[in-house]
Amino acid sequence: MIQVLLVTICLAVFPYQGSSIILESGNVNDYEVVYPRKVTALPKRAVQQKYEDAMQYELKVNGEPVVLHLEKNKGLFSEDYSETHYSPDGREITTYPSVEDHCYYHGRIHNDADSTASISACDGLKGYFKLQGETYLIEPLKLSDSEAHAVYKYENIEKEDEAPKMCGVTQNWESDESIKKASQLYLTPEQQRFPQRYIELAIVVDHGMYKKYNHDSDKIKVRVHQMVNHINEMYRPLNIAITLSLLQIWSNKDLITVKSASNVTLNLFGNWRETVLLKRRSHDCAHLLTDINFTGNIIGLAYKQGMCNPKLSVGLVQDYSSNVFVVAVIMTHELGHNLGMEHDEEKNGKKCNCKTCIMSPAISDPPAQLFSDCSKNDYHTFLTNRNPQCILNAPLRTDTVSTPVSGNEFLEAGEECDCGSPSNPCCDAATCKLRPGAQCADGLCCDQCRFKKKRTICRIARGDFPDDRCTGLSNDCPRWNDL
C-alpha cells in the first residue's frame, strides 16, 4: 500500500519584485520571487515516497498569505502507458515505464472555493493556480544554489507575435445539422450532472518538434506530461477523466507528410491513426503535436463529433508557445471539438454565459480555463445522440489507496473528516471520524458541525450566473448547475 507524507512548504517572498526575466515559459516582465522551505509533518505509518501523495504549500501572492493544497493526479497515466521512439535506422522502440510514483498534482487554494491548481513537482514547482479569479503561473528560477521560484500572471509574458491565433474548425466543417439543432436547448440541472467518462489519449510528437527541443526526448516527455495534467484539470467540471495512454515521438522522421495546410495534415494523420496506430495500441483519441506553422494563423484543428471514430477521433495542435499551459488550453479546445463542441461564437445570438471560454475560436489573453453553457449543451447532446462507446470504460491503472494523514485537507480512505487539530469540535483527531452528533467538520455548507439549511447561499454569483446554494444534505457547496 502506498504511504502518504504530508509536506508543508513555507515560501517567503523576496523583498523585491523582479522587473524582467527570461524563464522557460518566455520573457516575463513582472514577477514575485519566493523561496521554498520544506517543513515535514509527522505522517501515520509513513514510508517515504519520492513524491508524496498529498502536499501543502504556503506562499505569499501580492503580499497576502496563501495555502496551496495538492494531491497527486493518480489517474494521469494508464496502467499500460507506453512510450515509443525510433532509432536512426527506423526501428520502433517501445518501453513501458513505471509511472506510479510520478510528480504531477491537482489542488486548490485554502478558503477559495473557486480555486484550482495544476502543478508539476518534478524539479521544483511548475504550473498554474487560480486565486480569487486570477490565474498565476509558478516555475523555478533555475539559479545556482538557490530554491527561488517566480510567481507571475500570464499577461506579464511578452508575446512574440500579437496576431490572433485561431482554431481551424469552421461553423459547418464536419458538423451534423441534427446535432446542431438539438444543442440550442438549455440543459436542465439534472442534465448538467454529467456522467463519468474516460478518454484514453494518445499523443504523437512530430519530427519538427523533436528537433525544436534539440532531440531531447526527456524534455518532450516532461512537457507532454505537464500538458495532459493541465488538460485533465480543465475537464474535471465535465466529469471527464483524461488519461495518457501512449506517447510516441517521431525521432527519426515523420511517419506522415506534415503540411502547412492543416486540413490536409489532419486527414493524413487520421488515416495513419486508423491504419497503423490503432492496430498497435488501443486508445480513444489521438492528437498530433507539431512545430509546423499552419497557414492562416491556425494553431489547432480537429474533427467535430469524431470521438471514438477510427479515423475522425484525432486532432492537431501546434506547439507554438514556450508556455506549456497555453498549449494545454489549445489541446483542451480541440478535444472539445472531438466531443461535439462548437465555437462559442457560432450560437446564432444565444448567450453562452462566458466572455472568454475554452471554445472561443481565437485563444484569449489570458487563455480561458472554463467551458461555456453552450459547450456543455453541445457535449450533453453529443453524449445523448451519439453515445460514444469507447469512453465508457475506465482505463487500466493501479488503484492505490492513500494511508490516512491528519490535517492534509483531503479525505483519505476510511476518513469521515480531515482530522487536523485535536481541538476540532466536529472531528475526532485520533480516528478521523465525525464526533457523535456531528454531520460535518468543514466546508462552505457546514456550520458548527451541522449542515446549513437548504438554499442557504454559500457562494456569491459572478457575472450572469446565479448564487450557489446549499442542499441541506451535504457540507459541499454545489455549483448552480449541479443542483
From Swiss-Prot:
Tissue: Expressed by the venom gland.
Domain Disintegrin: from-to ranges: 403-483
Pfam families according to UniProt: Disintegrin (PF00200), Pep_M12B_propep (PF01562), Reprolysin (PF01421)
Residue intervals of the Peptidase M12B domain: 197-395
Keywords: Calcium, Cell adhesion impairing toxin, Disulfide bond, Glycoprotein, Hemostasis impairing toxin, Hydrolase, Metal-binding, Metalloprotease, Platelet aggregation inhibiting toxin, Protease, Secreted, Signal, Toxin, Zinc, Zymogen
SMART domains registered for this protein in UniProt: DISIN (SM00050)
Its EC number(s): 3.4.24.-
Motif (Cell attachment site): 462-464
Cofactor note: Binds 1 zinc ion per subunit.
Annotated propeptide span(s): 21-190, 396-413
An example molecular function term from Gene Ontology annotations: toxin activity
Subcellular localization: Secreted
Co-factor requirement: Zn(2+)
Signal peptide (residue range): 1-20
Assembly, per entry: Monomeric (disintegrin).
Additional notes on this entry: The disintegrin belongs to the medium disintegrin subfamily.
Family, per entry: Belongs to the venom metalloproteinase (M12B) family. P-II subfamily. P-IIa sub-subfamily.
Protein name, as recorded: Zinc metalloproteinase/disintegrin
Lineage of producing organism: Eukaryota, Metazoa, Chordata, Craniata, Vertebrata
